[in-house]
C-alpha cells in the first residue's frame, strides 16, 4: 500500500485560521470587558457622593435600581446598583439573538461531528475494498453470472474441441461479457465517486455554516453577559478598618477593586469602586463552543489525513472481471485519485 500525504497550502491556512479564531475567542472569555465602567464612591466629610460611569448602550431602555444600606454599628454604607434591560430593549433582543445562535451553533456542531465521525470510521474500517452497500448484491449477481458463463464456455470447449466455429463464437461471447463487466464496474466506480463528492459537499457546507455561526457568536462574546448587571460599592465613614478587601457578591460574580492611599478609606481622595460583566453562564457556553470546536477540528483533520491515503490502483483488477469479487470493488473513499 502506498501512502501519499499531499496537504494543500489552503488546507493548512484554513486550519490555522480556525485555531487562531478560537484561541482569540478563548482569550476573550478571560478579558475584562470595558462595557461597564467603574462606579466611584468618594468621601466628602460626613456625606458621600456617588459617581456612576457607565459605557451606556441604549440608555433610553436602561433601568437602574439603587438600594442603600447603612450599618449603624460600623457605619458601613452599602450601595447596590442593579442595571437591567427590559424585553423591548435592543440590547435584550441582542442577548436573545446570541442565545439562539448558540443553540443553532451547537446543533450544527453535533451534525458535523456525527458526519465526520461516521465517515472517518467508514474510511478506517472499509479501506480493504470491501463494499457493503446496495451494489454488493448486484455485483455478486453479475460476477456469479459471469462465472457460470465461463464454466459453461469451458464445458462447451471441452465437449466441442473439434468444432472451431462454436469455439470462436464462445470466445466472442466471452470477450463481450468481459467488456460488459468492465463497463459495469466502471459505472459502479463512477457512482461511488459521485456518492463521495456528495458527502464531501455536505460536510463542506456544514463546516462553512459552522464557521459563519462561530464568527457571529464570537463577535457577541463581549456582549454575551447576563441580562442583569449588579454592582456593589462599599464606603466606610471612619478610618479604623481596612476596606480594601473582598467585595461580597449579590447573586452574581463580581470583580472588586479598591484604591486608597493607605489601604483604608478615610480621605477625600480615597475611593473604592467595583465593576462586573458577569460571565458565569456565558463563560460556560463559550467553553462549550470552544472545546466542541476543538473536537470538530480534530475530527476534520483526521478526515483530511485519511482522505490522503491512496492505495495502489493496480490492486484492483481492471482487465479481469472474471476473477473479481465484491471485496475488490473500491469503496467510497478508497478510490485512487
Curated annotation (Swiss-Prot):
Regions of this protein lying in the Extracellular compartment = 32-100, 219-285
The keyword Zinc-finger appears for this protein: no
S-S pairs: none
Residue ranges, annotated region (Disordered): 148-179
Question: What is the organism field in this record?
Answer: Dictyostelium discoideum (Social amoeba)
What's the source species' lineage? Eukaryota, Amoebozoa, Evosea, Eumycetozoa, Dictyostelia
Please report the name of this protein according to its UniProt entry.
Uncharacterized transmembrane protein DDB_G0284909
Which PANTHER family does the UniProt entry name for this protein?
LIM ZINC-BINDING DOMAIN-CONTAINING PROTEIN-RELATED
**Compartment(s) where it occurs, according to its Swiss-Prot or TrEMBL record:** Membrane
Transmembrane segments annotated in the record for this chain: 11-31, 101-121, 198-218, 286-306
Q: What is its main location?
A: membrane
Q: Which domain of life is it from?
A: Eukaryota
Q: Which terms in the GO cellular component ontology are assigned?
A: membrane
- Positions with biased composition (Low complexity): 148-167
Record keywords, A-Z: Membrane, Transmembrane, Transmembrane helix
Amino acid at each position: 500500500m502506498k501512502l501519499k500525504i499531499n496537504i494543500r497550502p489552503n488546507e493548512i491556512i484554513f486550519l490555522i485560521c480556525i485555531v487562531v479564531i478560537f484561541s482569540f475567542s478563548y482569550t476573550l472569555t478571560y478579558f475584562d470587558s470595558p462595557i461597564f465602567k467603574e462606579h466611584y464612591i468618594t468621601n466628602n466629610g460626613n456625606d458621600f457622593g456617588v459617581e456612576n460611569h457607565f459605557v451606556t448602550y441604549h440608555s433610553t431602555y436602561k433601568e437602574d435600581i439603587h438600594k442603600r444600606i447603612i450599618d449603624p454599628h460600623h457605619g458601613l454604607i452599602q450601595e447596590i446598583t442593579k442595571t437591567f434591560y427590559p424585553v423591548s430593549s435592543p440590547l435584550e433582543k441582542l442577548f436573545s439573538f446570541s442565545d439562539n445562535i448558540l443553540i443553532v451553533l451547537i446543533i450544527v456542531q453535533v451534525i458535523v461531528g456525527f458526519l465526520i465521525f461516521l465517515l472517518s470510521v467508514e474510511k478506517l474500517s472499509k479501506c480493504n475494498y470491501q463494499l457493503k452497500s446496495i451494489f454488493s448484491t448486484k455485483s455478486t449477481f453479475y460476477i456469479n453470472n459471469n462465472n457460470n458463463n465461463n464454466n459453461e464456455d469451458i464445458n462447451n470447449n471441452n465437449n466441442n474441441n473439434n468444432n472451431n466455429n462454436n469455439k470462436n463464437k464462445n470466445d466472442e461471447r466471452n470477450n463481450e461479457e468481459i467488456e460488459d463487466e468492465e463497463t459495469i464496474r466502471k459505472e459502479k466506480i463512477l457512482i461511488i465517486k459521485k456518492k463521495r463528492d456528495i458527502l464531501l459537499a455536505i460536510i463542506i457546507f456544514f463546516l462553512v455554516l459552522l464557521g459563519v455561526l462561530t464568527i457571529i457568536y464570537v463577535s457577541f462574546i463581549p456582549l454575551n453577559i447576563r441580562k442583569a448587571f449588579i454592582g456593589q460599592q462599599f464606603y466606610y465613614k471612619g478610618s479604623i478598618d481596612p476596606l480594601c478587601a473582598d467585595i461580597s457578591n449579590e447573586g452574581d460574580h463580581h470583580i472588586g477593586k479598591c484604591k486608597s492611599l493607605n489601604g483604608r478609606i478615610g480621605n477625600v481622595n480615597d475611593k473604592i469602586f467595583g465593576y462586573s460583566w458577569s460571565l458565569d453562564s456565558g463563560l460556560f457556553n463559550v467553553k462549550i463552543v470552544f472545546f466542541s470546536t476543538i473536537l470538530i477540528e480534530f475530527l476534520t483533520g483526521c478526515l483530511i489525513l485519511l482522505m490522503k491515503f491512496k492505495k495502489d490502483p493496480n490492486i484492483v483488477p481492471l482487465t479481469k472481471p472474471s476473477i473479481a469479487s465484491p471485496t475488490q470493488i473500491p469503496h467510497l473513499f478508497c478510490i485512487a485519485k
